[in-house]
Amino acid sequence: MGALIGEMIALSLMALALGMDAFSVALGMGLLRLRLRQIFYIGLTIGLFHIFMPLVGMAVGRFLSREFGSIATYAGGVLLLWLGGQMIVTSFQQEEGTSFLPHGAGLLFFAFSVSLDSFSVGLSLGIFGARTMATILLFGLFSTVLTWIGLLVGRHFRQWLGSYSEALGGSILLVFGLKLLFS
């Protein structure tokens, strides 16, 4: 029983760490003009990706973990750099609106980039034989809720920042992209 509790605590802490990463990125995304319905779907989509990606990672397991661990981190960094750059460029254009819209393919692209780190964690957990169902449910729950919180906090600050909010949001994504590339 003690081992089960210890594993659940460890998995919860990992889920919190991955969820905090999603929260940080969601702060930047929340600076866009988002409706509550969009916030709901963005959080839900990121949560689903945080279920799917570690599940795939756990299935791939030990053999590929060394090769894909660093590749996934670099790919996530490049994706966040691209998305952040797009947001910054768009903020300086005179058009009302944005080239990145958090729905459809853009939302899937964003959710994929945010959840790449959970793929790497899933690879590691697959090696150690962690409980699959507990892992993916905790990862999905934490990332969904923390994404919602990040989007709502970002949305609140958008009112204070006005037209500079999208550039700031893009800058936040750029910083996290650089962090992934150089850590």
From Swiss-Prot:
Record's protein name: Putative manganese efflux pump MntP
Superkingdom classification of source: Bacteria
Major localization class: membrane
Native organism: Geobacillus thermodenitrificans (strain NG80-2)
UniProt-annotated location(s): Cell membrane
InterPro entries: Mntp/YtaF, Put_MntP
UniProt entry keywords in alphabetical sequence: Cell membrane, Ion transport, Manganese, Membrane, Transmembrane, Transmembrane helix, Transport
A Pfam family reported for this protein in Swiss-Prot or TrEMBL: Mntp
